[in-house]
Amino acid sequence: MAANRFTRGIAFSLSTLSFCVAALCTSTQAGAQPAAVTIGVTLSSTGPGASLGIPEKQAIGMLAPTLGGLPVRYIVLDDATDPTTATKNARRLATEDKVDAIIGSSTTPACLAVAAVAADTRTPQLGLCPFVPSAAQMRYVFSLPQSVAVMADAVLDDMKAHKVKTLGFIGFSDSYGEAWLKDIQARAGARQIQVAPVERYARNDQSVTAQALKMMSANVDAVIIAASGTPGALPMSTLRERGYKGRIYQTHGVANNDFLRVAGKSAEGVILPVGNILVAEQLSPSHPGKAVATDFAKRYEAQYGAGSRNLFAGYAYDAYLVLDRAVAVAAKQAQPGTQSFRDALVSAIEQTRGLAATHGMINVNAQDHSAYGEDGRVLVTVKGGKWTID
């Protein structure tokens, strides 16, 4: 299915990436042109979130020149992992470029910043990181990655199975770390797991020795690190260096090869929940998302090298799959570039059911704007420097 969804031939201009193939912009009916869809994208291509934003940008660069049968133009901006810049980018995309939807951003703080603009301008947002918008923002905001709740259940169930009773927490001192802490604390009690001590660090910190020593002093059975990208390697490597022997868990925010490269041998044995794309070939042949995940992984690696697949490129492609289906529906009701079209797009996305994507099956409804349930996750362990399903 996805074999014809990729193309090269994207023109780069400064920080803006856009394309529109001329043959597709010319209508088959003389004197008429089909209305083009414009999609804004703000990603963390630089800064601490670059290991997430770069592959997302690469995936956008592989997309077909149509969306829902209409020509499409993508405008891609870099927010440098800065929520303030993400806000400016989103505002520009919505008010100046008048995009039909916004994809992004790459990190939770930046996604939340974009959500505020999306709600204010009534522009659909497809976030590429797990986050929970406010009730007032929910109408126009969707989140592609697996929710913290879905992933937290997977790691907590594994902890219970391995008789973990005490759990230390080291997480980002931002909305991503806070989301994981709240969810872990809310769910751990039912599994008779005590969460303490709780430590934080910033994405650009160079040392977490003090936090690691507190874990060692408490002699906890396991530690979970709530971080994303390569900064997630720091607490883990510090714990290993200090001789910590307990189980170490990470979140799906670190699931890329840059993390493995930075973490080195300290990543061996770490446990984390990931999406299907990372281990597509290891999935059961009957898994409903295996075909799409395997196909995209092969095409991505053909372009960017063996082993380069990652969750984040998959999220960007999943955004395309969702929009491709939704645009085809919305275009029957309104013209791109209008508020009526954007509203129709939201309604169409809310009707997404059983869409096979790189992480599993996407199901969305008006009450739940997250994409994946339990079938969109799998627990893996790093063995021999590779992601392995136990």
Report each predicted region and the residues it spans.
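Bacterial N-terminal signal peptides
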Residues: 11-26
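Extracytosolic ligand-binding ectodomains
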Residues: 2-9, 21, 31-390
